[in-house]
Amino acid sequence: MRPKEQVQSGAGDGTGSGDPAAGTPTTQPAVGPAPEPSAEPKPAPAQGTGSGQKSGSRTKTGSFCRSMIIGDSDAPWTRYVFQGPYGPRATGLGTGKAEGIWKTPAAYIGRRPGVSGPERAAFIRELQEALCPNPPPTKKITEDDVKVMLYLLEEKERDLNTAARIGQSLVKQNSVLMEENNKLETMLGSAREEILHLRKQVNLRDDLLQLYSDSDDDDDEEDEEDEEEGEEEEREGQRDQDQQHDHPYGAPKPHPKAETAHRCPQLETLQQKLRLLEEENDHLREEASHLDNLEDEEQMLILECVEQFSEASQQMAELSEVLVLRLEGYERQQKEITQLQAEITKLQQRCQSYGAQTEKLQQMLASEKGIHSESLRAGSYMQDYGSRPRDRQEDGKSHRQRSSMPAGSVTHYGYSVPLDALPSFPETLAEELRTSLRKFITDPAYFMERRDTHCREGRKKEQRAMPPPPAQDLKPPEDFEAPEELVPEEELGAIEEVGTAEDGQAEENEQASEETEAWEEVEPEVDETTRMNVVVSALEASGLGPSHLDMKYVLQQLSNWQDAHSKRQQKQKVVPKDSPTPQQQTNMGGGILEQQPRVPTQDSQRLEEDRATHSPSAREEEGPSGAT
């Protein structure tokens, strides 16, 4: 049995299995003779590097010793015994301890009966001391060793990553090379096929050339043979002639074809081949001539195509130049079109402005026409209204005639007929006087102004109700020429306003002069009438009544007022019909002119007060004035 089995059985069967010396025996250095100089171990190359490397080498040698001891084969065992752990022979092999091991190893291993466990353990200890006199010391692993190992592992990982990358790149390169190799193989196969095809063609051509050369040689040989045959026939003919001279005439002649057939048995086959080859040669020559003609035609066609291509290129160059010129013209036309479009837009804007102006002018013309028609209506109304003062004038004349009667009769009538007999006479007379004064004192121009304002409001409503004309119908005529410089609407309106203002100022001045003349004529009469009104009001307030008034004086004042009013109406009629009245002028000017402020006098104030007091509402409230 091997020492390995003995060690295992000793470790398991012996009583000292728990002894540390038995499991891990401490080997003491064996004292023995000094080794020979030849047997000294050579220094290991790793001993000079440091203590760490020394310890590593020792652990490696210890593990090597264990592996050699526990090994299964006998070869490492014998090598270990005779060479030692470091190469030379062990130091304890010459002593008496291990002297009998090599003679009877079975007695020490445990094959002999009666060997106990302690003896086996002692044997193992002695064997270990003899074989490993200097066992390597055990070393503890430190953090530095761990860091070094981790650093080495990281380096290994990096190396592996780089190797993997290199392998991937190599795989890619290999795939690319494989593809290229496949392509090259396909190209090689196609090249080989082409080579075979070319070889076949070359062989065929060689055969044809050989046949052609053979046919030429055969022709030469046949010519030579024909010449020789002709010479021989001539010779034979001469011989026959000689023989005929020698022989009788009836002797048969020998057949020459039999002799030639006997001499050349393959002549017919060769002649047939020669004919076939000649026919093929003629056919090939015809094909060659035909191919030459075709090549010439192709050359001519190529030349024609080249000429046509050159002509087409020239035409393309010319067309490109024409195209460039047309593009330039097109760009120019585009610019002109844009300019014309801008001008068209400007003209359209001008047309729109002109249309708006024409619309405004049409509206103004319509308004002027309406104003003119209204002025004509007002003129006719004024004429109708002027006929009324004539009637009033006639009434005034009748009143004057009545007033021209002698006063004595009146007084006599007054004295003869007492006032108490006519109780309602003073009241009716006072009422008639008040109504007549109201009619004559009130200015008729007030009613004209009210009528004109009403007409204007109606005209404005009609203009608002009428729809504006469409913008499409407002087209300028064909012969319409736009002015070079248009006058703005603001300036045009300002000019019109200045003109109307000047006309209105002149009209106002004329109207003011007429009104002053009329008031100069009317003022004394108004003063008298107001005086009479004051007297009447005073008498009514005192309770005396209007019976104490002088009727002659009242009627005379009334006739004077009617005469003044008729004169005023005659002055208005004297104005020519074509010249518009101040009211019409104000209407045509686009508005009502401001009237000149009258100078406020005491008489005018009294007239205004009388108008206010004698208004219809006051009349309704007061009732008949004679009721007081």
UniProtKB/Swiss-Prot annotation:
It is found in: Cytoplasm; Presynapse; Cytoplasm, Cytoskeleton; Cell projection, Dendritic spine. Residues 1-62, 212-264, 372-411, 451-529, 562-628 are annotated as: Disordered. Its main location: cytoplasm. Residues 276-444 are annotated as: Sufficient for self-association and interaction with HD. Pfam families: HAP1_N (PF04849). Signal peptide: none annotated. Residues 152-319 are annotated as: Sufficient for interaction with KIF5B. Keywords: Autophagy, Cell projection, Cilium biogenesis/degradation, Coiled coil, Cytoplasm, Cytoplasmic vesicle, Cytoskeleton, Endoplasmic reticulum, Endosome, Exocytosis, Lysosome, Mitochondrion, Nucleus, Phosphoprotein, Protein transport, Synapse, Transport. Residues 32-44 have a biased composition (Pro residues). Residues 168-301, 327-367 form a coiled coil. GO terms for cellular component: autophagosome; axon cytoplasm; centriole; centrosome; cytoplasmic vesicle; cytosol; dendritic spine; early endosome. This is Huntingtin-associated protein 1. The lineage of its organism: Eukaryota, Metazoa, Chordata, Craniata, Vertebrata. The gene is Hap1.
